[in-house]
A protein has these predicted regions:
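Membrane-embedded transmembrane alpha-helical bundles that form the catalytic cores
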Residues: 2-496
Length: 497
């Protein structure tokens, strides 16, 4: 068979785009290029896992670094640097006691935070803080943010602290530590996984059971539907409104304000489902990151259900070290508020994230004050639960609006439109103009009624299906995703953090 020069050139261009970093189209979990790479990776991984654990770990580390490169370019050098520094210091820390042990912990945590702050907050500190306070005009070249740095930095810190406190006292080799810190399913946006959850299974080198394989496939399907089908579609209208709120009616602005919380939930939980599913296929259990968060009846409950791995991280490594609830009620309220303020800043270098964190901190304090200090709570009846849910959901949606915008000016225009240009008469025309968007929002909100037991039953029923039926459902799911998402694939929102 003869191939033309054009065909060979096109094939080479396709291969180049698959293996070389493309700034205009970074590799994303859930994309077709990632699926092709993962199938190729999985075949070799399965062989190496049976042959040599060391070879398997080296292979996964190399693939993880390649994945980081495809997402972020050469900025991925920060990842192996962080791994080597943290491993060397924590290994030295194991050999010491007392002040020397504490000094080494302090050193490695400060190094981790210094690197995080340099890449993530330098432009913010110089541009938004220093220039505003001192009326200066300093400017810096834009500093490229290593994708996932907030997540793998927190994993590195948790490992160091748990080693210092001997909560995790298992001997770990350099390869095992690099595997833990670079493991690609959780590299870009978590879940933030503790060493005790991952390294023991890595040492056992167990193959994935058939139940894990099918659970992984189920979660990948669920994540694809959430992210590629629903979130990306909902995002199109939301982005139009948030980019130019003055060109839309008050009703449309309000729709976008309520649409964004649905979008970010589908986006982030969809990514988490896919990453947990990929890890399960590789033989590793990762912790759940979402547990029906929009069913919460208080802000306190919301943070037990939303981004669970981050909530627990801040609880264990910020809130409790600050004193938690052990130093009086006033200090407890202050610790809650400060922890959420830091959590807001963790999300990004913007005053909007600080405000978002402050709103959640305020919500936590108010709920704890009324329920614990005053003993006032809404009765746990159907009507009472409905009222608690409505208050909580509206407050969380209000806080999300600050999370989405770049400055208060945009948000002011949106709420001004809602206040002065809102009419229920827009409801029917809006539905006729955007029926699919409206049905997506209604459908997702109705899914809030879905109980945990029903979800686990659905997952169990999928696992019990014949393997042919499972693969057929997966193929149908892929076809639906390709048909719906082929026009516009949105980057994961949490990639920027």
């Amino acid at each position: 068979m003869n191939y033309s020069t054009f065909e060979i050139s096109a094939l080479w261009h396709w291969i180049e785009r698959l293996f070389v970093y493309q700034a205009d189209s970074p590799l994303m979990m859930g994309s077709i290029p990632f699926a092709l790479l993962f199938i190729f990776f999985l075949a070799i991984y399965t062989l190496l896992k049976s042959y040599s654990r060391t070879a398997m770990m080296m292979y996964v580390i190399c693939f993880s670094l390649f994945f980081a490169y495809k997402v972020n370019g050469m900025v991925m050098w920060m990842l192996p640097l962080t791994a080597c520094i943290n491993y060397a210091v924590t290994q030295e820390m194991r050999l010491h006691e007392g002040k020397a042990r504490k000094a080494l912990l302090t050193f490695v945590v400060l190094v981790d935070l210094a690197l995080l702050c340099y890449f993530k907050y330098t432009n913010f500190i110089i541009g938004d803080v220093v220039n505003e306070m001192f009326s200066t005009n300093f400017s810096l070249q834009s500093i490229a943010l290593p994708v996932g740095i907030s997540f793998y930095t927190f994993q590195a810190i948790s490992y160091a602290v748990d080693t210092y406190k001997r909560k995790f006292d298992m001997e770990v080799t350099l390869l095992e530590y690099c595997f833990y810190l670079t493991f690609f399913p959780l590299l870009m946006a978590g879940p933030i996984t503790r060493a005790a959850n991952l390294i023991p299974r890595l040492k056992r080198n167990e193959q994935a059971s058939s139940r894990m394989l099918w659970t992984g496939l189920f979660l990948i399907m669920l994540g694809l539907v959430k992210k590629n089908m629903l979130s990306d579609y909902i995002a199109q209208f939301n982005n139009w409104v948030f980019d130019a709120p003055q060109t839309f009616s008050g009703f449309e602005n309000l729709a976008a304000l309520f649409g964004y919380p649905v979008q970010i939930f589908l986006d982030f939980s969809g990514y988490s489902d896919m990453s947990i599913g990929v890890a399960a296929i590789l033989g590793f259990y990762l912790p759940d990151n979402f547990y029906f968060p929009y069913r919460s009846l208080s802000v306190t409950e919301f943070w037990r259900r939303w981004h669970i791995s981050l909530s627990f991280w801040f609880r264990d490594y910020v809130y409790i070290p600050l004193g938690g609830n052990r130093k009086g009620k006033v200090r407890m309220y202050f610790n809650n508020f400060l922890t959420m303020l830091v959590a807001g800043l963790w999300h990004g270098s913007s005053w909007m994230f600080v405000i978002w964190g402050a709103l959640h901190g305020f919500g936590l304090v108010v709920h704890k004050f009324f329920s614990r200090q005053l003993g006032i709570s809404i009765p746990r009846t159907l009507a009472g639960n409905s009222l608690s849910w409505l208050i909580t959901y509206l407050y969380i949606c209000f806080a999300w609006s600050f999370f989405r915008v770049k400055d208060l000016g945009v948000l002011g225009k949106m709420y001004d439109k809602v206040a002065n240009d809102f009419s229920i008469d827009y409801l029917v025309p809006f539905f006729h103009a955007r029926p699919a968007w409206t049905l997506c929002i209604i459908g997702v909100m109705l899914s809030y009624l879905f109980t945990e037991r029903q979800y686990h039953r659905l997952q169990a029923q999928f696992i019990l299906l014949p393997w042919v039926a499972k693969l057929l459902l997966f193929i149908i799911c892929l076809q639906m995703v390709v048909e719906v998402s082929q026009e516009s694939v949105q980057p994961f929102i949490y990639y920027q953090f």
